Curated annotation (Swiss-Prot):
<keyword id="KW-0150">Chloroplast</keyword>
<comment type="subunit">
    <text>F-type ATPases have 2 components, F(1) - the catalytic core - and F(0) - the membrane proton channel. F(1) has five subunits: alpha(3), beta(3), gamma(1), delta(1), epsilon(1). F(0) has four main subunits: a(1), b(1), b'(1) and c(10-14). The alpha and beta chains form an alternating ring which encloses part of the gamma chain. F(1) is attached to F(0) by a central stalk formed by the gamma and epsilon chains, while a peripheral stalk is formed by the delta, b and b' chains.</text>
</comment>
<dbReference type="Pfam" id="PF00213">
    <property type="entry name" value="OSCP"/>
</dbReference>
<keyword id="KW-0809">Transit peptide</keyword>
<keyword id="KW-0813">Transport</keyword>
<comment type="function">
    <text>This protein seems to be part of the stalk that links CF(0) to CF(1). It either transmits conformational changes from CF(0) into CF(1) or is implicated in proton conduction.</text>
</comment>
<keyword id="KW-0472">Membrane</keyword>
<dbReference type="GO" id="GO:0045259">
    <property type="term" value="C:proton-transporting ATP synthase complex"/>
</dbReference>
<keyword id="KW-0375">Hydrogen ion transport</keyword>
<feature type="transit peptide" description="Chloroplast">
    <location>
        <begin position="1"/>
        <end position="33"/>
    </location>
</feature>
<comment type="similarity">
    <text>Belongs to the ATPase delta chain family.</text>
</comment>
<protein>
    <recommendedName>
        <fullName>ATP synthase delta chain, chloroplastic</fullName>
    </recommendedName>
</protein>
<keyword id="KW-0934">Plastid</keyword>
<keyword id="KW-0066">ATP synthesis</keyword>
<keyword id="KW-0139">CF(1)</keyword>
<dbReference type="GO" id="GO:0009535">
    <property type="term" value="C:chloroplast thylakoid membrane"/>
</dbReference>
<dbReference type="GO" id="GO:0046933">
    <property type="term" value="F:proton-transporting ATP synthase activity, rotational mechanism"/>
</dbReference>
Length: 219
């Protein structure tokens, strides 16, 4: 029986998880077909190095944090992506962020390499590719959890544990999204599947049933 660990903390950037302990030894990474082979190569190199050094979870948290910052901080993203801004300034900004966040040295070296090779514009895609490879290596199913209000950590943990049973995945990673249109309850989306336990979903199902019944009576 898989033991469910506690939900990930702030550095997970709004992503909760139930994780299994990683297997010892280096794991094989198979890169899925993507548009940018350069992004693939940077992500693959980092994920393999982190796994080899036994720092995969820590580096994954770092990359998750970088991806979150790029999405949520428009000014930072604009500065990083701007080809006119000098490399030294970009390196200094990233160094400050890395120090405050407590990034692993492997992550810092990776960011510096991207500055040196003028590849910072690929950061979002590299982060996506890293996430894909990480999930592949750790048998992690990523699921989007949409709810009308923010769910408590314990609620998220229980949902993740249930999904673990339904999917058979060793690990489940929830990405919470607030959607006030749901009224109450939540919707979980993973792969091509969806579990709708929202009030809006219930209303729509009732309305659909009533429509069918009325149509049947009139026909």
């Amino acid at each position: 029986m898989l033991a469910a660990k506690s939900i990930a903390g702030p550095r997970a950037f709004k992503a909760s998880a139930v994780r299994a302990a990683p297997k010892a030894g280096r794991r094989t990474v198979v890169v899925m077909a993507r548009k940018n082979e350069v992004s693939e190569s940077y992500a693959k190199a980092l994920v393999e190095l982190a796994d080899e050094k036994g720092k995969l979870e820590a580096v994954h948290a770092d990359v998750d944090a970088v991806a979150g910052l790029m999405k949520e901080n428009a000014k930072l993203s604009a500065l990083i992506m701007n080809p006119v801004v000098e490399s030294d300034k970009k390196r200094a900004v990233l160094a400050k962020i890395a120090k405050e966040a407590g990034f692993q040295q492997y992550t810092i070296n990776w960011l510096n390499l991207l500055v040196e090779k003028d590849r910072l514009s690929l950061v979002p895609e590299i982060c996506e590719c890293f996430e894909d490879l990480y999930c592949q290596m750790t048998d992690t199913q990523v699921a989007t959890l949409r709810s009308a209000v923010k769910l408590e950590q314990e609620q998220q943990f229980l949902i993740a544990k249930k999904l673990q049973e339904l999917t058979g995945s060793k690990n489940i990673k929830l990405k919470p999204v607030i959607d006030s249109s749901l009224i109450a309850g939540f919707v979980v989306e993973y792969g091509s599947s969806q579990i709708d336990l929202s009030v809006r979903g219930q209303i729509e199902r009732v309305a659909d049933q009533l429509t069918k019944e009325m149509t049947a009576k009139l026909s």
